[in-house]
């Protein structure tokens, strides 16, 4: 996936600001090929590999497909996520393209729900429904294009982030079951994640 760990002394400018293109946290979502649109419970069809600031990696069961076929699928690309409210209710990670202030992610096709748009807006990383339900319920879809995390470990997941967090996110759409890390020289004392076209898998 192109994750590369950069020594901390090479990661900040003279003002102590993280250099452009570098992230202290990142998430890679796998694709294990088990998602079934007819299944109401698809948590575990993806794994979220969370790269932490301390150099450790933790994993969470996840789902990166929407609850119904008439909602868009975020393509395999690098996006950014920031800490914010999901539907005004609880804190989650709000995804968007780089430099976008409207929580939009450009798609590679027309949005099936809104055919006049080639983007998805308001896609978050949030917890799954009750008992890890991932389908369409009485109040609508659990995911209208969002990424879902195991509800039983949600507090642990979101606890790794805060209002200052700026997180790099990429989801596999090519059946990649775990991060390749082919250009990674991983050392536990190296804390910064830099991406080099992570969606181009060698």
Protein language model features and the residues they cover:
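Cell wall/extracellular polymer interaction/catalysis modules
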Residues: 1-140, 154-202
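Short Cys/His-based metal-binding microdomains
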Residues: 149-150
């Amino acid at each position: 996936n192109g994750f590369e760990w950069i020594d901390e002394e090479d990661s900040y400018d003279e003002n102590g600001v993280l250099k452009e293109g570098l992230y202290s946290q990142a998430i890679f979502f796998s694709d294990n090929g088990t998602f079934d649109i007819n299944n109401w419970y698809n948590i575990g069809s993806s794994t979220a590999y969370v790269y932490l600031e301390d150099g450790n990696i933790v994993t969470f069961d996840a789902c990166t497909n929407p609850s119904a076929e008439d909602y868009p699928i975020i393509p395999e690309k690098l996006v950014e996520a920031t800490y914010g409210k999901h539907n005004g209710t609880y804190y989650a990670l709000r995804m968007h393209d780089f430099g976008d202030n409207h929580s939009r992610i450009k798609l590679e096709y027309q949005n099936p729900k809104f055919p006049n748009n080639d983007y998805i807006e308001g896609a978050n990383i949030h917890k799954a429904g009750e008992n890890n339900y991932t389908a369409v319920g009485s109040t609508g879809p659990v995911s209208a294009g969002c990424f879902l995390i195991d509800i039983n470990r949600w507090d642990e997941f979101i606890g790794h982030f805060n209002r200052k967090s700026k997180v790099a996110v990429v989801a596999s759409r090519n059946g990649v079951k775990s991060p390749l890390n082919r250009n990674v020289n991983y050392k536990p004392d190296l804390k910064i994640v830099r991406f080099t076209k992570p969606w181009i898998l060698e």
